[in-house]
């Protein structure tokens, strides 16, 4: 499994509740661009439209040598492929509990197919983000103190 791109902001802005794997409908030039690392999931999100799941606002740059006729839009909606039962479960959670569906990463599976890792997530408040940063900083300081103690300084 080779990770092509990752949404690091999702872990900072959301509390991840459950992960899912979804196929993604792409054109050939988009797959080439992904393999070259020309993608960004920073502000991307998923939405259910007419019973189908779409990845919105994911930026996949087109290649310069792609014919202008075949160039897909860089931020266009891309259909995600999941079982109907999973989509209905996501729809129920999003509509009832105020959750969001967030794209975490795009990767190649063992059969070299591009897959999207999406998550059911709940937004963090500002104080939750600050607590997480404080906790991370405290862990980092504790680790460095343990290393210094082990070395004998």
Curated annotation (Swiss-Prot):
Residues 132-153 are annotated as: Disordered. The keyword RNA-binding applies. It is found in: Cytoplasm. Residues 132-142 have a biased composition (Basic and acidic residues). Pfam families: SmpB (PF01668). InterPro entries: SmpB, SsrA-bd_prot, SsrA-bd_prot_CS. The keyword Nucleotide-binding does not apply. One of its GO terms (biological process) is trans-translation. PROSITE patterns: SSRP. Signal peptide: none annotated. GO terms for cellular component: cytosol. Keywords: Cytoplasm, RNA-binding. SUPFAM superfamilies: Small protein B (SmpB) (SSF74982). One of its GO terms (molecular function) is RNA binding. PANTHER family: SSRA-BINDING PROTEIN (PTHR30308:SF2), TMRNA-BINDING COMPONENT OF TRANS-TRANSLATION TAGGING COMPLEX (PTHR30308). HAMAP family: SmpB. Belongs to the SmpB family. Required for rescue of stalled ribosomes mediated by trans-translation. Binds to transfer-messenger RNA (tmRNA), required for stable association of tmRNA with ribosomes. tmRNA and SmpB together mimic tRNA shape, replacing the anticodon stem-loop with SmpB. tmRNA is encoded by the ssrA gene; the 2 termini fold to resemble tRNA(Ala) and it encodes a 'tag peptide', a short internal open reading frame. During trans-translation Ala-aminoacylated tmRNA acts like a tRNA, entering the A-site of stalled ribosomes, displacing the stalled mRNA. This is SsrA-binding protein.
């Amino acid at each position: 499994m080779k990770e092509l791109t990752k949404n690091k902001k999702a872990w900072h802005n959301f509390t991840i509740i459950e992960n899912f794997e979804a196929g993604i409908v792409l054109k050939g030039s988009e797959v080439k661009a992904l393999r070259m690392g020309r993608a960004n999931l920073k502000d991307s999100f998923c939405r259910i439209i007419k019973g189908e799941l779409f990845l919105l606002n994911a930026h996949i740059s087109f290649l310069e040598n792609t014919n202008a006729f075949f160039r897909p839009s860089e931020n266009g909606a891309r259909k995600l492929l999941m079982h109907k039962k999973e989509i209905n479960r996501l729809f129920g959670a999003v509509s009832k509990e105020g959750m969001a569906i967030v794209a975490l990463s795009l990767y190649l599976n063992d059969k070299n197919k591009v897959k999207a890792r999406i998550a059911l997530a709940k937004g963090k408040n500002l104080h939750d983000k600050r607590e997480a940063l404080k906790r991370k900083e405290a862990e980092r300081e504790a680790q460095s103190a343990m290393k210094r103690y082990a070395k004998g300084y």
